[in-house]
Amino acid sequence: ELAIMKGRVDGLEARVNGIEAGSFSETTSMSGKVEMQIGAGSNGAAIVGDNNNEEQTTFAYHYEVDLNTSFTGDDKLNIEFAAGNAAGTNTVQGITGFGESQDALTIEDVNYTFPLGRWDVSVGDSMDLSKNFPNACALGTIVDAMDDCGAKNAVDAGGDVSVSLGTEFADGWEFGFGFSGDSGTSGIATKESTDGLGAALGYSNDTYGFTFGYALADGGATANSDTTYYGATAYYTPEGMGTLS
C-alpha cells in the first residue's frame, strides 16, 4: 500500500509540475521618479518664441511611474505614466527634456520586451528605437543637450511606434539596432512619414567602456530635411575610484 501511495504522490507531483510550467504567472513591480528645475532668463532674446518680459523665473517639474510586469520571468511589459507642468513646446535641444504640460497625467510609453534566441526584442508605442542600444555614458540629466554625455540623438534616439533589438555577441561586446515609424496618418515607412532608424556598437568591462552610435531621422515629405546623427560615449574607472564619464 505504501508503494502504491508513493506512486500516486509521484504522479500527482508530476502533474502539478506540468501545470506550473504551462501556467500564466505574472509579477508586477512599480517604480518612479520626480525631476524638478528652477531657472531664470535674462533680458536677451527669447530662446523659444517671442517674449518681451525682461526677466523670467520659472519652476518646472516632471514625475513618472513605471509598472513592469513579467509573465514568464524572461519578458517585461512596461507601462509608463507621466505628468508635469513644463510647456510642451520647450523641448528643443538645450532646454529640458520635459514634454508634459497642464499637469495632465498621460500614458507616456507602452512597450513589451522578450527574448528571441540571443536577442532582446522590444516593441512598443512611444518607445525609443534605441531601447536596447548599449550606452557607455553614466551621466543623466533633465537637459536634453547634456543627457547621455552630449550624444543623446545618436545613442539614445527617440521614437514612436518602434522595434528595438540588442545582443551581446562576444565577451563585453554589444550591438543594437532599431526602427521607428510614424504613428500618425502618414503611415509607416512611407514617403510622407517621419521615420527613424539607428544602430550602436559598444564594449565594456570593469575598467572602461565605449559606445559608437548612429541614427537617421527622416524628415518625411519635406525635401532635404533628413538628419543624420553620430555620437560616441565612454567611461573610465581608475582602480579604487568611482566612474568617470
Task: Specify the residue positions occupied by each region the protein language model found.
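Beta-barrel outer-membrane channel/assembly domains of diderm bacteria
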Residues: 1-130, 143, 147-184, 192-208, ...
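Long, hydrophobic, well-ordered secondary-structure blocks that form the structural core
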Residues: 138-141
